[in-house]
Amino acid sequence: MAKPARHTSKAKRNKRRTHYKLTAPSVQFDETTGDYSRSHRVSLKGYYKGRKIAKANEAK
């Protein structure tokens, strides 16, 4: 089996892993519904760009 030519130190390994991050989703205020929703997606009430385009699932 192949072996690494050099031992990777903990510092080198950890510096490489510093770029693995979670990013927060972009959220915008929807003036039509008064709720926050993700950009470029249909809101939970069925609105997209201020127009009703889908039926919302109502909890009973």
UniProtKB/Swiss-Prot annotation:
GO terms for molecular function: structural constituent of ribosome. Keywords: Ribonucleoprotein, Ribosomal protein. The keyword Ribosomal protein applies. GO terms for cellular component: large ribosomal subunit. InterPro entries: Ribosomal_bL32 (IPR002677), Ribosomal_bL32_bact (IPR044957), Ribosomal_zn-bd (IPR011332). GO terms for biological process: translation. Residues 1-22 are annotated as: Disordered. Pfam families: Ribosomal_L32p. Residues 1-20 have a biased composition (Basic residues). PANTHER family: 50S RIBOSOMAL PROTEIN L32, LARGE RIBOSOMAL SUBUNIT PROTEIN BL32. Belongs to the bacterial ribosomal protein bL32 family. HAMAP family: Ribosomal_bL32 (MF_00340). This is Large ribosomal subunit protein bL32. It comes from Streptococcus agalactiae serotype V (strain ATCC BAA-611 / 2603 V/R).
